[in-house]
């Protein structure tokens, strides 16, 4: 697409060489999070001090963090490369409400059961990925629910008021870009003005509703949901689908991301139609049983497990309506209850490719669309904030699923670059502030641990890959020296500080050949991993320029040219990339040799 000479000319014109990194890790994931010398230990101690400080804040000083002490919460970090992290890195707080609650535990730990609300959606998509074939993902909903076909026809002439059901697929539902209504009345009534009664509706200037004659409500089964004498239709998937048929869309299909519980209920209905199993059976056979998630439930746990659960209710009525009420279709959207330790098993299984092949998982863990915020993308059903490292400008995507309903708020965050994840679980009767508080805890985790994880990964990479590699062929003067640039603000990645090939100084010769002999930073001498698989004993790294893109501003169009991904693999010799280096690693992850493939040689690491 763009030659290196073109890029160098552009960089010369701009005055400073700036190329953008690939998306992904800058070092192999860290394996030591729990030894006394690990930077992550220091990061966790810092986080602990921050959380303990938050618990001492007065509400008048900070109305959000000042109420943290009244929220029961648990925080845990886990790693696929250090099993000790799960037990080492946990923080728990018991609120006064929990300590005096009529039901449930008085002391939370890693096995305490919390509601996780919309984290449930991750389980639904996970299970769907195991059961839907590629054709199923692209079928219109009218294929699964033929009763929607008539409304789909009406939408051709009036898409503002009718949903285009024949344009929406399970893939659109999973990726939150289907345009279906957010919440399915009467199943979800949090935002329904009628819940406040007719007087409250009248105060807002809303007209009275006639359930039998209203053009919208009269088409819904069991539309008299507010009447306690009427059985709710929320326990039946078919009725639920029918109740959504004539509602207007939020957006056109595939036009704009919009959070919708309805979408995941419909995805659960698709899953049920294809497998013939209930969601309880599906989750158990696909996920709970294989992973040993013995304390995860699709509805409130049996009463003999309540001593292991957080149930911060004020009275029996609230217990019945908020904790025990579990309409069947909602099980694919937001009813799961789980523990810190069970969610560790769940998150680790995704990062480890335990239940899905690696290629399917990598495809899943990508943004599908963006929001209007530059730091926030959307996937299926990922919420993907983009963390920016304050010193280097490094961008790290945090694959997150939040949950907030009833008595509980939660966050599950996966970070593939480091092969780690963390969970925040919170319980409180203060629904107005609980989600904000859980989010503040998550902020603290990210800000304390991301720099520590990056530093630990860099330290291990220097130890495992740094040094000099030499030819073992007699008379061949070839060697590579790999170091780590520790200059403050230096872009992350190992550095080829010296490369002699057949007696020639390759780095100097490359700089002269590229027309930038006095600008070594413009040369590809920084190594970042592109294929990390110690199981095979081979790790691929590619050479990038020594500069990072986030440091300097670029033009909106001209900046497109300043990107390493546009030139990767461009310079070749004998059909092999000049910038590709394959390392041999032992069982401990330490490099024993390196093969710069284009140079047709293998260099052994000196002790």
Show where each model-derived region lies:
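Fungal secretory targeting signals
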Residues: 1-20
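Short hydrophobic "helix-edge" motifs at membrane interfaces and signal-peptide entry regions
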Residues: 6-8, 110-112, 266-267, 329-330
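Catalytic loop of the DD-peptidase/beta-lactamase superfamily, centered on the K-T-G motif
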Residues: 21-97, 111, 324-607
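Short active-site loop at a secondary-structure junction
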Residues: 42, 64-74, 99-173, 248-262, ...
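Hydrophobic residues within well-ordered, non-membrane alpha-helices that form the packing/core
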Residues: 55, 128, 145, 271, ...
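Short, surface-exposed loop or secondary-structure junction motifs
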Residues: 68-70, 80-82, 92-101, 153-411
